Amino acid sequence: MTQWVFQPEPHTALVVAQSEALFPVRRVYCVGRNYAEHAKEMGHSGREAPFFFTKPANSLVQILENREGIIQYPPRTKNLHHELELVVALGSGGSNLSLEQATEAIWGYAIGIDLTRRDLQSAAKEKGRPWDVAKGFDQAAPIGLLYPRSQTGLLEKGPLFLDVNGIRKQQGDLTQMIWSAAECIAELSTYFELKAGDLLMTGTPAGVGALEPGDHVLGSIEGLGQLSFRIDA
């Protein structure tokens, strides 16, 4: 009789807002430099084709509404950065999707924070190495409740902001994305067969910056509530 060598971890899932449902997470894709002003602050300009990287599904940390989560300051870094992002959850998938098909694949949305060990990322860039240790560490992706598209409609505009200790650090609008969520999904589907349960973090506006132990972080996107957490030593 076949049996596990050891008991596997529970499947990563997100809580669906205003319900008892759970959304099973398959993969977490991320879009780089998808807001022009953020691209500039990172030393780039122009409308380049979207590029992608990934985070492990088990790097997600579910943050419930009206509760402050706790994120441990990660090891091997002295420059941990916050990046506020709209997260898109897919309810269907496929390969080589048209823009219309990509739009129809969107199941819902959440607030996400792409935490980044910026010093390790910079060192990797200089050496032409992958970003995994900078982007895929434990607790690297705090994420809020998942709101079904049936409730929110398509999110293509609306303000988003991030505060650290009550001070506004990031502010923008979803209309400022260089590539829309659907355009990113369509492009991503030319590289991978997308499936239900995939998440896409769609990029961050300008104003990324360092976090220190003890900092309180609050992220908000219109229609998706708020996400808050504290950085623990």
Located regions from the model:
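Catalytic-pocket segment enriched in acidic/His residues
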Residues: T2-F23, H38, H44-G46, L64-E65, ...
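Extended, compositionally biased flexible segments
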Residues: T2-Q101
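A generic structural signal for short beta-strands and their flanking turns/coil linkers
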Residues: R27, R47-A49, P56, H82-L86, ...
